[in-house]
Swiss-Prot record:
It is found in: Cytoplasm. It comes from the Bacteria. Together with its co-chaperonin GroES, plays an essential role in assisting protein folding. The GroEL-GroES system forms a nano-cage that allows encapsulation of the non-native substrate proteins and provides a physical environment optimized to promote and accelerate protein folding. This is Chaperonin GroEL 2. Its EC number is 5.6.1.7. It is an enzyme of class 5 (isomerase). GO terms for molecular function: ATP binding; ATP-dependent protein folding chaperone; isomerase activity; unfolded protein binding.
Length: 542
């Protein structure tokens, strides 16, 4: 495919035009009085959102140079979302401000590499200052405040705070769509996985269609069980203890399943058989987790353990197991706390090393089931459009609240960045273009506050100058128009979100300024004339 090449100022201005189009679409959503953006979908209903990364992902520009500029800024939003789960709009606005000021200086003759170095030094110093300003999250109310600001709804913030309070730091909070109106919080007691009983004959509570076994033995097998002769020696040992038996294996079928069902129906022996969750290596890992949690061993020929020679000391124990047709919950497993802690540490290391979002998510779920708990927020609304918008807001707010618990909080409303820059730049010892790069950062750090004020109907420049003179932590409450102690009023941001937004914006801005040549694909004539394929159809008699 033929290429187009742009040099020098033309190259940078083409990229800037693309960046501005994307950033201007995103910036209107910032703050308590920010507006929403409607995104057209090829299939299904349009989406209404105020989430920066969702808007950025949907923007595709026609001009090749502008398209590349927009893609570079998309990367800022995506990276911030991956690291912190929120702050994507702030990151985009910071990137735009850094690039705009930077290009102005490059056009005036500044050395781009000197500017880039100055930007990097200044951002590192501001990040350190933000970390110093950060306060630990000490109360449930503070979690509720940060989640409420992200979601724009105090009821959602309160529910998220309750969920995180129940499941702890390592817990997982998921958001699901519900068929009913409003919000509902569902908490899981113990470890739950999404596989139920193999046969409905195992049910002990006919009304609830559940099999509930108290103080059972738990047999964990990494293979299918079909022959009753393999299972019989163990069944006899368990029956002598008068305890029920839970079997978690790849499958139980044939005469082995028939024997268990017949004994259950006759009342001779209470048991339930459950298929192991997951597939392949993930199934092995989850079975290992269950074994550690219950103090048992995975019976597998890989480690030289055979079903027919299994003894009671290789079985796991738990206070209670509840099995429905779709899921199994293990309550209070009898595993060794030190072994569980070791397994948790191992999973944490795997999360740190993993470069796949999907793998990280699955590992985080395993970690939560072992170390924390699982809370599900069920959200319902009158229409599908409202449901999707609400669900999206809640997911962002959950990420925001988790980030606050992780690294602490700073004053919200764009104030922390502005005030951190005042103290950070007092100690900077730079000269020439590097000093200019630091000044670019100082100017850019006022951009989020200016935009929040502007979206709320105030004069941005006036608000910025007023906040500069206020004590640290004091600033504009854009919802009411008052200048208050932001942390005391509950207007707070997680420092992780604020820091990630700045670092990612600076990373892309520095690269933007050093660009001298842009090479892009030349648009084909066919794409320009009829991208929807109508032209091709016309020649076929349609």
């Amino acid at each position: 495919m033929a290429k187009m090449i742009a040099f020098d100022e033309e190259a940078r201005r083409g990229l800037e035009r693309g960046m501005n189009q994307l950033a201007d679409a995103v910036r209107v959503t910032l703050g308590p009085k920010g507006r929403n953006v409607v995104l057209e979908k090829k299939w299904g209903v349009p989406t209404i959102t105020n989430d920066g990364v969702s808007i950025a992902k949907e923007i595709e520009l026609e001009d090749p140079y502008e398209k590349i500029g927009a893609e570079l800024v998309k990367e800022v939003a995506k990276k911030t979302n991956d690291v912190a789960g929120d702050g994507t709009t702030t990151a985009t606005i910071l990137a735009q401000a850094l690039v705009r000021e930077g290009l102005r200086n490059v056009a005036a003759g500044a050395n781009p590499l000197g500017l880039k170095k100055g930007i990097e030094v200044a951002v590192e110093r501001v990040s350190e200052e933000l970390s110093k300003q950060a306060k630990e999250v000490e109360t449930k109310e503070q979690i509720a405040s940060t989640a409420s600001i992200s979601a724009g709804d105090s009821a959602i913030g309160g529910l998220i705070a309750e969920a995180l309070d129940k499941v702890g730091k390592e817990g997982v909070v998921t958001v699901e769509e519900s068929n009913t109106f409003g919000l509902e919080l569902e908490l899981t007691e113990g470890m739950r996985f999404d596989k139920g009983y193999i046969s409905p004959y195992f049910v002990t509570d006919a009304d609830r269609q559940e099999a509930v076994l108290d103080d059972p033995y738990i047999l964990i097998v990494n293979s299918k069980i079909a022959a009753v002769k393999d299972l019989l020696p163990l069944l006899e040992k368990v029956m002598q203890t008068s305890k029920p038996l839970v079997i978690i294996s790849e499958d139980v079928e044939g005469e082995a399943l028939a024997t268990l069902v017949v004994n259950k129906i006759r009342g001779t022996f209470k048991s339930v058989a459950v298929k192991a969750p997951g597939f392949g290596d993930r199934r092995k890992a989850i079975l290992g987790d269950i074994a550690i949690l219950t103090g048992g061993q995975v019976i597998s020929e890989d480690v030289g353990l055979k079903l027919e020679s299994t003894s009671l000391d290789l079985l796991g124990r738990a206070r209670k197991i509840v099995v429905t047709k779709d899921e199994t919950t293990v309550v209070e497993g009898s595993g060794d706390p030190d072994q569980i802690a070791g397994r948790v540490s191992q999973i944490r290391n795997e999360i740190d090393k993993s470069d796949s979002d999907y793998d990280r998510e699955k590992l985080q779920e395993r970690l939560a089931k072992l170390a924390g708990g699982v809370a599900v927020i069920k959200v319902g609304a009158a229409t599908e459009v409202e449901l999707k918008e609400k669900k999206h807001r809640i997911e962002d707010a959950v990420s925001n609240a988790k980030a606050a618990v992780e690294e602490g909080i700073v004053a919200g409303g764009g104030v922390a960045l502005l005030q951190a820059s005042i103290t950070a730049f007092e100690k900077l010892d730079l000269s020439g273009d590097e000093a200019t790069g630091a000044r670019i950062v100082a100017l850019a750090l006022a951009a989020p506050l200016r935009q929040i004020a502007s979206n709320a109907g105030f004069e941005g420049g006036v608000v910025v100058e007023k906040v500069r003179d206020l004590p640290v932590g004091h600033g504009l409450n854009a919802a009411t128009g008052e200048y208050v102690d932001l942390i005391a009023t509950g207007i707070i941001d997680p420092v992780k979100v604020t820091r990630s937004a700045l670092q990612n914006a600076a990373s892309i801005a520095g690269l933007f300024l050093t660009v001298e040549v842009v090479v892009a694909d030349r648009p084909s004539a066919g794409a320009a004339e009829g991208g929807d394929g109508a032209g091709a159809m016309a020649g076929m008699g349609f």
